[in-house]
Design a protein with these regions (language model features):
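Membrane-interface helix/loop caps of multi-pass membrane proteins
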Residues: 1-360, 367
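Internal/C-terminal transmembrane anchor helices
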Residues: 361-383
C-alpha cells in the first residue's frame, strides 16, 4: 500500500456518514422495525478514517496512544454520557420498578462501551422499538465502535514498537497483512455464528470486525485506485449510494446481519469511499448532493440524533402503553430528537471538542484529558 491521501475533510464521506445515521433513525421511527443498514455503513466509515490515520502514523513513526484516545473519546463520550444520564433520570420517573435493574445495567454497560457484550451475554435479541425495549439498546453499535477505536490504535502502536527499526512502508505492509487476515477470519466467523446463533452474532465485535475490516482495507488500497478514470469511480459512488439506500427496503437485516447479506450496505459504503477519495464524486455530481446544506446539517448532528432518538422513542411508547408508534407519534419523536441533538451538539459536543483540541497540544494536557474522560465514564457507570 502506498501513501494515503491526508486530505483533512471530505464532504462526501461526512455526508454519507450523516446519511447513514439518519437512515437508522428514520427506519427506527417509520420503518416498522426494519434494519436500515446505516449502522453497517457507519462502522465501515469509522474504520476507514481511523485506519488512514494509523497508516500515516506508521509511516511517520509517531503515534501517541494517549493523544489518540483523548481526541477520539472527547468527541464520543460527552454527548453519550449526557444521554445516558438523561435516560436513567427519565426512566426512573416513567418505568416500573421491575425494569429499574435493567435500566441501571444498560447504563453501566453503555458508559464503558460494553452494551453489545451485555446484550449478547444476556441473550437479548435485537428487537424493534416497543414499550418493553431497552432504552440503551442502540448503544450496542457505539460500544462495538468504541472497542474497535481502542483496539485498532493499540495494534498500530504495537507494530510501531515491535518493528521500530524497519521502514514505515514495511510497517504499513505488516498492518495490512494483519488486517487482511483478521477481516477474512471475522467474515467466516460471522457466517458460522449467524447460522448457529444470529442474535449473538448481531452484537458481537468479532462477528462485526469484517465490516470494520472492509473500511480498513479500503484505506490501504486507496492509493492504488487514484489512477482510475474519474467518471468510472464516480459511477461507482452512485452505485454505492443506491446500495446503501436500498438495503433497509430489500434485506431483513435484523435476522440476516452480520452475515453475507451485510455485504450489501458494506460494499455500498466502500464504493462511496472510493468515489470520494479518488475525486470521481466531483465529476458526477455526488459531491454536490452529499454536501447539500440539509444533508450537511444532519451530518453535523447525526451522532447526537442517533443518541437521542431511541430513548425518546422507547419512553414515548412506554408512556402511551403502545407496542408500536404511528406516523404522528414518530414525527413528534423526530422533532424532539432534532431539537435535543441541536442543543447537545451546540452546547456539549462542540465545546468539548474545542477544549480537547487545546488540551491535546501537549502530552501533559493529553494525559489529563484522557484521565478526565475515563473518570467521567466510570463515574456515570458507578451511579
Amino acid at each position: 500500500p502506498g501513501q494515503l491521501s491526508s486530505r483533512a475533510f471530505s464532504h462526501e464521506i461526512h455526508g454519507v456518514r450523516g446519511l447513514a445515521l439518519t437512515m437508522v433513525v428514520a427506519f427506527h421511527l417509520f420503518g416498522q422495525g426494519r434494519v436500515s443498514g446505516g449502522v453497517d455503513v457507519f462502522l465501515v466509515i469509522s474504520a476507514y478514517l481511523m485506519t488512514g490515520s494509523m497508516i500515516r502514523s506508521l509511516q511517520s513513526g509517531k503515534l501517541s496512544l494517549v493523544r489518540r484516545y483523548g481526541k477520539t473519546f472527547s468527541r464520543l463520550l460527552p454527548p453519550a454520557l449526557l444521554t445516558i444520564v438523561f435516560t436513567v433520570v427519565v426512566g426512573l420517573m416513567i418505568l416500573p420498578r421491575s425494569r429499574w435493574l435493567g435500566l441501571f445495567e444498560g447504563a453501566q454497560a453503555s458508559s464503558v462501551f460494553m452494551e453489545n457484550v451485555y446484550l449478547g451475554t444476556a441473550g437479548l435479541t435485537y428487537e424493534a422499538a416497543g414499550d418493553s425495549a431497552s432504552p440503551f439498546q442502540h448503544f450496542w453499535s457505539l460500544s462495538a465502535q468504541g472497542q474497535f477505536l481502542i483496539l485498532w490504535p493499540l495494534l498500530a502502536f504495537l507494530i510501531l514498537k515491535l518493528f521500530s527499526r524497519i521502514s514505515g512502508d514495511t510497517r504499513v505492509r505488516i498492518f495490512f497483512g494483519f488486517t487482511l487476515v483478521a477481516t477474512g477470519a471475522s467474515f467466516l466467523y460471522a457466517l458460522l455464528l449467524v447460522g448457529i446463533d444470529q442474535p449473538v452474532a448481531y452484537y458481537s465485535l468479532w462477528a462485526r470486525m469484517w465490516e470494520f475490516g472492509a473500511g480498513a482495507l479500503a484505506a490501504f488500497i486507496m492509493p492504488w485506485l487514484q489512477s482510475l478514470r474519474k467518471l468510472f469511480v464516480g459511477a461507482l459512488g452512485w452505485m454505492g449510494i443506491t446500495l446503501i439506500l436500498s438495503s433497509g427496503f430489500l434485506i431483513d437485516g435484523a435476522t440476516k446481519f452480520p452475515g453475507a447479506w451485510a455485504l450489501w450496505p458494506v460494499m455500498g459504503a466502500v464504493l462511496v469511499l472510493v468515489s470520494a477519495d479518488t475525486g470521481g464524486a466531483i465529476d458526477v455530481g455526488l459531491t454536490r448532493v452529499l454536501s447539500w446544506k440539509p444533508i450537511a446539517w444532519l451530518a453535523n448532528r447525526g451522532y447526537a440524533l442517533y443518541l437521542w432518538h431511541w430513548p425518546l422513542l422507547v419512553y414515548f411508547l412506554s408512556v402511551k402503553g403502545q407496542a408500536s408508534i404511528g406516523y404522528l407519534g414518530a414525527a413528534a419523536v423526530l422533532a424532539a430528537s432534532l431539537i435535543l441533538s441541536e442543543l447537545s451538539t451546540r452546547y456539549v459536543s462542540a465545546p468539548a471538542v474545542r477544549g480537547a483540541n487545546g488540551a491535546l497540544t501537549s502530552p501533559a494536557g493529553s494525559g489529563k484529558l484522557l484521565a478526565i474522560l475515563i473518570a467521567a465514564a466510570v463515574g456515570v457507570a458507578a451511579l
